Structure formats: structure tokens, C-alpha cells
Curated annotation (Swiss-Prot):
EC number(s) from the headed UniProt entry: 3.6.5.-
Primary subcellular site in the record, as a coarse category: mitochondrion
GO MF annotations in UniProt: GTP binding; GTPase activity; mitochondrial ribosome binding
tr-type G domain sequence ranges: 55-236
Gene source species: Aedes aegypti (Yellowfever mosquito)
Matching Gene3D superfamilies: 3.30.70.240, Elongation factor 4, C-terminal domain, Elongation Factor G (Translational Gtpase), domain 3, P-loop containing nucleotide triphosphate hydrolases, Translation factors
UniProt entry tagged with the keyword Transmembrane: no
Name used for this protein in its record: Translation factor GUF1 homolog, mitochondrial
Role according to the record: Promotes mitochondrial protein synthesis. May act as a fidelity factor of the translation reaction, by catalyzing a one-codon backward translocation of tRNAs on improperly translocated ribosomes. Binds to mitochondrial ribosomes in a GTP-dependent manner.
Length: 656
């Protein structure tokens, strides 16, 4: 028993206790050490995983509002199952990006396989950590496709928030078993009973089924593991069938190419076997297989029901299509597994190097980041004012912020980002116009400079979202005022409790991409939460607003606005330009034009030399002659001069 205690509890002490065992024979010591090494090796032995039957596998995810303790709970579950050692430094173990640790959010979905003994049986629990923010809902959707149930985590202090509602409906739509859990019950202001009642009011969840835990100190976390085993069903997987697997995430490794995170639906796969992509038809040889615990542990095979990492020498991330089905090459046909609807970018922004000499470096940095984020779209763009750059498409504002921050942190790049815009759908009219656009009756435009004139268009459509706002009741008036100002239409209103109300609005995406969230937080003193989901395109009265400087069109300053806001937006923009453009030798007329009509104008006065300063009396005709000569000179200069608008002016107008 002494040797067993030393080996299992503190293996590092073996060399220190050898003198205590010197009386044993060499054969006994060798036999004991051999037994020890076999036991230690068994933790990495792949047979421990692939010999666990499908009935004892649980694939689950944790979904929650931002900062409700999702990553902290994941840390505790990893510790309780012995996947990682218990230590004070275990914070956001599954969050590997620097931006994730700084912002306290999850951006990329991560996975960890946990071995959990329960009632004399060994269970394999595959934890798939998901992002919490709406912008990364595609990551959530990918993760849930490999799950059979979810833990719905709610802060017992803050209660149900907007993204809690969105995540609940996402899980319900996929018909997943939901285990409700209240976190942070150790806080002084925690109100678990009231929050449990909120869950019943909004989702009809029985308060008696709600678990109460503190992920920070570990209270009640073991009960979560037990309920995962009890409530969640095993995956619908068949090991006797031929191999099929679903790719639900991927990332790029500079040495191994695209690595695929897969859920094995049927059969098994071994290293050296050949597989085929159902989407592209390309064949690959499996180079590596691994379980994530949460670091990679190489295995020889993955079997149905398991989640693991598959490397097959895909050269680019474009070969790895999220939602694609992989199948064995020996099979002649492929029945694809239900995949995902590809996410379309909702917000676009121009990205330009601050110095054009940095263009190649910034291009390389963007290409490397896009390898790991397939949701970003990239197209070349150029501007006379800002030079060569790119127009990038993002899922939302946080997605844009995170991408920009990763450019700065990981590649030390500090680009110019223009104000975000959205994509408009346009229905063209006239056979010639449709033919000029490749025969497409409908086109999508994200660059305002390319927005077609009304004479070419039958109908304009702009993207709308269904927004959910949860806020204190006393803030209802100001919030309604803000939403009405942003052209929002109220759909529903529900009192969660005596102090908070949940309202849903149909609102244009263009009205919320800039500062809506900041304004909402300001008028609610930070207590309101906001979430939105895509609602498709809605017909809208849109106009293109051009900016003219002394009659010359400036493409970089073109914007698309709703006709009801054209006048007010035009006044704001021309006034801002008047303040930013430096005075010059000629007078500058700053005009905002909509449909050929000037809707706002400001005049920037020219520098003027006092040509009469040398006069000291005498005939007034001399004075008039000098002033006339000056006026004619200014007129001639205005006709031939180019207006010099500094680059900084464009940056200040266009930047976020």
C-alpha cells in the first residue's frame, strides 16, 4: 500500500522513497514500476475512449449570455473529471486567444473530452465550448450540430439577458435537451429564486429542475456532471455502418494545413485510410487523429459517437467546408449529413494601411487571420484618398472589433478602419440594365459608391433584424424614444418581473451598426442588454447621398440613407466637413446632393489677403480696382485649382 500511495498520489516522490524500499528484491521493484508505468500510460491509451460504448457518450455544450461564467464552469468540469490539474491559474482554459482572455469572451469554439465515472461505469463527456455573443452565432450553430443537449447557464445576480433568450431558442430549434443552471449563487446580491421564476415565465422551465451552482468556488458543479449523464441522451451514432463524419469547425495550422474538428456519425476512421469530401469530391489520406483533453492526444482511430481532430493534409482552409460530410473512399456514394446554412456577412468595413508601404505586410496578416475565420469575406478595394486596401465583411460589430484587435495584437498592424456599412439588395428594371449586370435581376451592393440610381431600380431592400432588449422598467420611455428614432417597430413586450421588461423590435440593421448599443447602455446606466437575429430584407425608401466639393464628386464620402433621414444626415455631414477641411486660397462649397437636388450646404471661406492695407486715403476708385482684381484672381483660381483635402480629413470622417 505504501508503494501504491507514492505512485498514484504523488508520482514525483518515487525517487525520494526508493531508499525506503531498498529491502525489497530488484524483481519486486521492477514489477511494481512496470505496473505503475502501465497505469500511467493508460491515461493516454486510445482504447479507453474507443471502447466506451455509444450509450455511455454524452456530447454537450454550454450556452450563456456574455460574462455569465461559461468558461469558468468549463474549467471546473475539466478539474472535477481530472482532465486538468486543480490549480489557481486555471482561468478560461478553453479560451486560447489573447482577445478572449482580455475581453472575457469566447470567440472560437473549443472542445475537450472528459472521462467521468458514474455508478460504476465510465462515461465519455465531450464538452464543446461555444461563444456567447450574437456575432459568433455561427460558431454556436456549428457546435450545437454535434451536441445532444446543452447547459443553459444563467447568472443568478443579473438574471435572464437578451442573449440567454437567443441561445435558448437556438437550442430549442435544434430539439436539444436543455439543462438549466443558475451560476454565481455565492454572490451577495444573488437572487436564485427570482431568476428561476424568470426562467419559468419566459421558457416554462420548472424551477425544481434548475440546478444552482457557483462555478468560481466549485459549489454544485459535480451535480452538473451527474445531470448531464442522467438527462442527456447518447448520440445517434452507429458503429456498424460505413464511416461518415460531420465537420463542425476547422482551423489552419501552418505546418499541418487545415485541421478539422469532426463528429463521427457512423463507423470508424483510422490513420492511413482515405476519405472523401462530400462537397468538393476531393480525396484525402488521414494523416493524424486526436482527442482533445483539452490538449491534443494522438489516437489511432475515432469511432462513431466521438468528437475529435482529423488532419488530412488539406492545403488551405477553403478545402475544409464547415457542415461538409466526410466519408470513406471505398463507398461509391455519399449521403450528406444535415449541414449548416452558410453565414452571410452583415456588416462591411474598409481596411487600409496607414502607410501604403505597409500594404504587403497588412495583406499577409489579413490572409493569415482569414484562414482561421472563414466567416470573414475579403475583396480588394481602392480609394484615391486612402490608397489600396480591402473591403471586409463581418458577422457583426463585435466580430469587426475582435478582428481588428487580433490584427493589432498578433501582427502588430494598425490599419485604418472605415465606418461600417451594410449590404443592400436591389431589384433592377429594364432588360438592358439587367443584361449589363450579368442577367441578374437582383444584385447586392455593400459599397455606397456603387449604389445604382433610382431610374435603374424597381425596388430597394435593406436588411432588418429582430432585436431583443431587456432593461429596467423605469428606462422604458427613453428606450422607446431611441428605438423610434432608429426607425424600429415594436413587436412584443413582456414583464419579466416587477423590475424588468423584455421588448422586441423590428429594426433596420443600418440603424444599429454604429452607436445603438452605446446609446442604449447610456440611457439605461449600463443595465440594458441587447441581442438581435437576422430577419431578412425588407423593401425600403433608400437614397444615395453624394458629397460635392465645388461641384466635384467625392466617391469616398458617398452614403446610403433612408429618405426620411436624408436632410438631417446631410446637415450633420456637411457641418463636420466644414470643421475638418482646412481653409484654402479658394472658397469651398460643401454640398450634399440627393437625386440631383442639393439638400444641405456649407461654405468654407477662403484665405483673403488685405490688398487695401497699403492705401492711406485718396481716391476710392483705387480701392475698388484692387478689390476687383483680387476677386477676378480668386475666380480664375477657383476654376483651375484642385481642392486639397488632407488624408487625415477623410480618416476622421470615415473612421469608426
Amino acid at each position: 500500500m505504501l508503494f501504491k500511495l507514492v505512485t498514484f498520489s504523488r508520482p514525483i516522490q518515487i525517487t525520494q522513497t526508493i531508499p525506503l524500499l531498498i529491502s525489497q528484491s530488484r524483481r519486486t521493484i521492477a514489477r511494481s514500476l512496470s505496473t505503475t508505468s502501465r497505469w500511467l500510460a493508460s491515461d493516454d491509451d486510445d482504447t479507453r475512449f474507443d471502447q466506451i460504448p455509444v450509450q455511455r457518450i454524452r456530447n454537450f455544450s454550454i450556452i450563456a449570455h456574455v460574462d455569465h461564467g461559461k468558461s469558468t464552469l468549463a474549467d471546473r468540469l475539466l478539474e472535477l473529471t481530472g482532465t486538468i490539474a486543480k490549480k489557481a491559474g486555471n482561468k478560461q482554459v478553453l479560451d486560447s486567444l489573447q482577445v478572449e482572455k482580455e475581453r472575457g469572451i469566447t470567440v472560437k469554439a473549443q472542445t475537450a473530452s472528459l472521462v467521468y465515472p458514474y455508478e460504476g461505469e465510465t462515461y465519455l463527456l465531450n464538452l464543446i465550448d461555444t461563444p456567447g455573443h450574437v456575432d459568433f452565432s455561427n460558431e454556436v450553430s456549428r457546435s450545437l450540430a454535434a451536441c445532444d443537449g446543452v447547459i443553459l447557464l444563467v447568472d443568478a445576480n443579473e438574471g435572464v439577458q437578451a442573449q440567454t433568450v437567443a441561445n435558448f431558442h437556438l437550442a430549442r430549434a435544434k430539439q436539444l435537451v436543455i439543462v438549466p443552471v443558475l451560476n454565481k449563487i455565492d454572490l451577495k446580491n444573488a437572487r436564485p429564486d427570482a431568476v428561476a421564476q424568470e426562467l419559468f415565465t419566459l421558457f416554462e422551465i420548472d424551477p425544481d429542475e434548475v440546478l444552482r451552482i457557483s462555478a468560481k468556488i466549485g459549489t454544485g458543479c459535480d451535480a452538473v456532471l451527474k445531470e448531464i449523464v442522467r438527462r442527456l441522451p447518447p448520440p445517434d451514432a452507429r458503429r456498424e455502418q460505413n464511416f461518415r463524419a460531420l465537420i463542425f469547425d476547422s482551423w489552419f495550422d501552418r505546418y499541418r494545413g487545415a485541421l478539422n474538428l469532426v463528429f463521427v456519425k457512423d463507423g470508424e476512421i483510422r490513420t492511413g485510410q482515405e476519405i472523401v469530401s462530400c462537397h468538393t469530391g476531393k480525396a484525402y489520406e488521414v494523416k493524424s487523429l486526436a482527442m482533445l483533453r483539452p490538449d491534443e492526444r494522438k489516437v489511432d482511430r475515432l469511432v462513431a459517437g466521438q468528437v475529435g481532430l482529423l488532419g488530412c493534409n488539406m492545403r488551405t482552409s477553403k478545402e475544409s467546408n464547415i457542415g461538409d460530410t466526410l466519408y470513406a473512399k471505398k463507398d461509391k456514394t455519399c449521403v450528406p449529413l444535415p449541414g449548416f446554412k452558410p453565414q452571410q456577412p452583415m456588416v462591411f468595413a474598409g481596411v487600409y494601411p496607414a502607410d501604403q508601404s505597409q500594404h504587403p505586410y497588412l495583406k499577409s496578416a489579413i490572409e493569415k487571420l482569414v484562414l482561421n475565420d472563414s466567416a470573414v469575406t475579403v475583396s480588394p478595394d481602392s480609394s484615391p484618398a486612402l490608397g489600396q486596401g480591402w473591403r471586409l465583411g463581418f458577422l457583426g460589430l463585435l466580430h469587426l472589433d475582435v478582428f481588428s484587435q487580433r490584427l493589432q495584437q498578433e501582427y502588430d498592424a494598425d490599419p485604418i478602419l472605415t465606418a461600417p456599412s451594410v449590404t443592400y439588395r436591389i431589384k433592377l428594371k429594364g432588360a438592358k440594365i439587367i443584361a449589363a449586370h450579368g442577367g441578374n435581376e437582383e444584385i447586392y451592393v455593400s459599397n455606397p459608391a456603387l449604389f445604382p440610381d433610382k431610374t435603374m431600380v424597381e425596388e430597394y431592400y435593406e436588411p432588418y433584424v429582430l432585436g431583443t432588449i431587456i432593461a429596467p422598467t423605469e428606462c422604458t420611455g427613453p428606450i422607446i424614444g431611441l428605438c423610434v428614432e432608429r426607425r424600429a417597430i415594436q413587436k412584443t413586450s413582456i414583464n419579466i418581473d416587477n423590475d424588468r421588461i423584455m421588448t422586441t423590435y423590428l429594426m433596420p440593421l443600418n440603424e444599429i451598426v454604429l452607436d445603438f448599443h452605446d446609446q442604449l447602455k447610456s440611457i439605461s446606466s449600463g443595465y440594458a442588454s441587447f441581442d438581435y437575429e437576422d430577419h431578412g430584407y425588407v423593401p425600403s425608401a433608400l437614397v444615395r447621398m453624394d458629397i460635392l466639393l465645388n461641384g466635384q464628386l467625392v466617391d469616398e464620402l458617398c452614403t446610403v440613407v433612408h429618405i426620411s433621414k436624408a436632410q438631417s444626415h446631410a446637415k450633420e455631414l456637411v457641418l463636420k466637413l466644414k470643421e475638418l477641411i482646412p481653409r484654402q486660397m479658394v472658397q469651398i462649397a460643401i454640398q450634399a446632393v440627393v437625386g440631383g437636388k442639393v439638400v444641405a450646404r456649407e461654405t468654407l471661406k477662403a484665405y483673403r489677403k488685405d490688398v487695401t492695407s497699403k492705401l492711406y486715403g485718396g481716391d476710392v476708385t483705387r480701392r475698388m480696382k484692387l478689390l476687383k482684381q483680387q476677386s477676378e484672381g480668386k475666380k480664375k483660381m477657383r476654376a483651375i485649382a484642385n481642392i486639397n483635402v488632407p488624408k487625415d480629413t477623410f480618416i476622421n470622417v470615415l473612421k469608426r
